[in-house]
Amino acid sequence: MSSIKVECVIKEKNEVGESPVWEEKDSSLLYVDITGQKVSRWSSLTKQIESMNTEKLVGCVVPRQAGGYVIAEGTRFAFVDWVKRSITAVAEVNEKPNTRFNDGKVDPAGRFFAGTMSMDMKPDVVDAALYNLQPDHSVVRHFDQVHLSNGLDWSLDHRVFYYIDSLAFMVEAFDYDIQTGGLSNRRTVYKMEKDEGIPDGMCIDTEGKLWVACFNGGRVLRIDPQTGKRLQTVKLPAERITSCCFGGKDYSDLYITSAYIGMDAEALAKQPEAGCTFKVTGLGVKGIPPYSYTG
């Protein structure tokens, strides 16, 4: 097995870096800074970054098949025209006060799933929900009673939906109906250990194993959702790890975003790479290309 290497490749720091998505056509990484209210693209070829400001706190960004991107910002879905630098609202969700969209991803049929979170971030507050934007621009609400909606992905056969509500400290699974987008048979596939931090973003590899970013845990875990076992831990030089995705040639590199929000000067001095985006090579596994929203 080749040796694992962790490298800070995007040194421009994000207060809350999130939602990394690999764009194969131009070898670039798409991501957001939630509290910085911007969407960015980093070219792995030129090392240059292009950014665009959003109008609200932006939880996530996904590619759109028709061109440009779709974001979930504030309590709405919106289209992004990267060329014109314009944002067009598509659909608003009827959320409780003091909530906003957080992480999201496109399913294999082209639906854009995204969940919300309470800005209070208290264990007893369950005001959030999971939604998806349909290709016809209508919105489906799947379930509520969520603390802090976060990482999500689908099994390789598209029959299982994996989901993280961060403050539940677990990874869950649902039976998934790819024809309707329906969810059923909710169950737990992994419970976080105390030293692993808060489960945040997540992605899947070609072996069907899950990679879970651990906020305040300084690591990414590889989990077998069939057995509930942790298979591997990759430690990072930053505590506030937020999300991850595979990219690079053959999708063999793991890109990992991080945050520096809430860290004081002493903590930042100890973790000078907090807020950086890392690339991990030598893992010996590959990911799958992201899906694009079809609406």
Swiss-Prot record:
Active site residues per record: 200
Gene3D superfamilies on file: TolB, C-terminal domain
Pathway: Cofactor biosynthesis; L-ascorbate biosynthesis via UDP-alpha-D-glucuronate pathway; L-ascorbate from UDP-alpha-D-glucuronate: step 3/4
Residues involved in a divalent metal cation binding: 18, 150, 200
Cofactor note: Binds 1 divalent metal cation per subunit. Most active with Zn(2+) and Mn(2+) ions. The physiological cofactor is most likely Ca(2+) or Mg(2+).
Keywords for the protein's UniProt record, in alphabetical order: Ascorbate biosynthesis, Calcium, Cytoplasm, Hydrolase, Metal-binding
Cofactor(s) this protein requires: Zn(2+); Mn(2+); Ca(2+); Mg(2+)
Annotated positions binding substrate: 100, 102, 120
Domain of life: Eukaryota
UniProt main location, coarse: cytoplasm
Catalytic activity annotation: D-glucono-1,5-lactone + H2O = D-gluconate + H(+)
TM regions (residue ranges): none
Localization of this protein: Cytoplasm
Biological processes, Gene Ontology terms: intracellular calcium ion homeostasis; L-ascorbic acid biosynthetic process; positive regulation of ATP-dependent activity; regulation of calcium-mediated signaling
Single Gene Ontology MF annotation: enzyme regulator activity
Pfam families listed in its UniProt record: SGL
GO cellular component, one term: cytoplasm
EC number: 3.1.1.17
Family per record: Belongs to the SMP-30/CGR1 family.
Described purpose of this protein according to its UniProt entry: Gluconolactonase with low activity towards other sugar lactones, including gulonolactone and galactonolactone. Catalyzes a key step in ascorbic acid (vitamin C) biosynthesis. Can also hydrolyze diisopropyl phosphorofluoridate and phenylacetate (in vitro). Calcium-binding protein. Modulates Ca(2+) signaling, and Ca(2+)-dependent cellular processes and enzyme activities.
Protein name: Regucalcin
